[in-house]
Amino acid sequence: MEKKKRYKSYLAIAGFFIGSGFGLLFAFSWNELVIVLNLVDGAWLAVISGIIRIIILVIMSSILFAKWFKQETIYTSDAYFLFALFFSILIVGKIYDIYNNLIVVSENATAEFVLFITKIRYLIVTMNIMPVLYIGLETTLALISAYIKNVNKSQFNKIRLGIVGIYLAIMLLIIIIAPTLSALIFALPYFTIGIYLLLAIMFFFMYKNKRLSQANALLIGIAFLCLIASSIIRSIITSIALENPSMIVVAEVITIIVNFVIFLGFITKPKYAKM
């Protein structure tokens, strides 16, 4: 019980600091944001659709955190916590998207500034993949270890950290060296698509071998395949949205549907877990 109270306090503190940070960010740029909202067609629609998605994500993450706290013993490596963390980082990214989508079309936004704030957005995307990648690697490597007897748990942990490290290094390299916004928007998705495909394969592998009982790995795998398609579509829409923010609504609807499928996979147990 004491451990649960401590983690609830950590989450509350994290929420406070993140909320305060966004409050300062929006306050600092408030005048420019208001001008964009009043002058750019479709800006209000884009903001409203973003807020709706944030509300949906808050509900999803709250349900997953509630499931985590209902467990008799909780660990930060638990699937429910990592799934909840996945949606929590999505919330942070979505709030930042509202700021990003408005500020990039303001009169004072230079090409360098737009590139900088977009790179921050992709850093959030990089962090967002981490919780699910951790689950996929942990379960997949644990299954492989049953067949490879000469590799112990410590060595598999090093392999997992190595894979995560390579992922972070490549993502950071792409983000840092991207010279223009167009290069960033069109180059990074190629690598993220590879990660999504890897995650889909890992979850299909887990489902086939009945290794994940807290969630439906088959549904999650299908959702990540859908995420590949939505990422391609979103990249195209994002470039169009620089001139027409109302196109963000189309991207939001597509992403909400995919997020909901992922959420269903997180909360739905597979048939083999019910037997």
Regions found by a protein language model. Give the residues of each.
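Hydrophobic alpha-helical transmembrane segments of multi-pass membrane proteins
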Residues: 18-32, 52-67, 78-104, 166-170, ...
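Membrane-interface helix caps and helix-loop-helix hairpins in membrane proteins
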Residues: 176-186, 240-242
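Cytoplasmic membrane-interface regions of multi-pass membrane proteins
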Residues: 1-4, 62-75, 137-152, 204-214, ...
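The cytoplasmic-loop to transmembrane-helix boundary for the fourth helix
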Residues: 2-20, 135-175
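Membrane-interfacial loop-to-transmembrane alpha-helix junctions, especially the N-terminal start
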Residues: 8-15, 71-86, 151-163, 211-223, ...
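Individual alpha-helical transmembrane segments in multi-pass integral membrane proteins
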Residues: 43-60, 76-141, 245-260
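First transmembrane helix
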Residues: 2-71, 186-208, 265
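C-terminal transmembrane-bundle signature of multipass membrane proteins
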Residues: 8-14, 20-30, 195-275
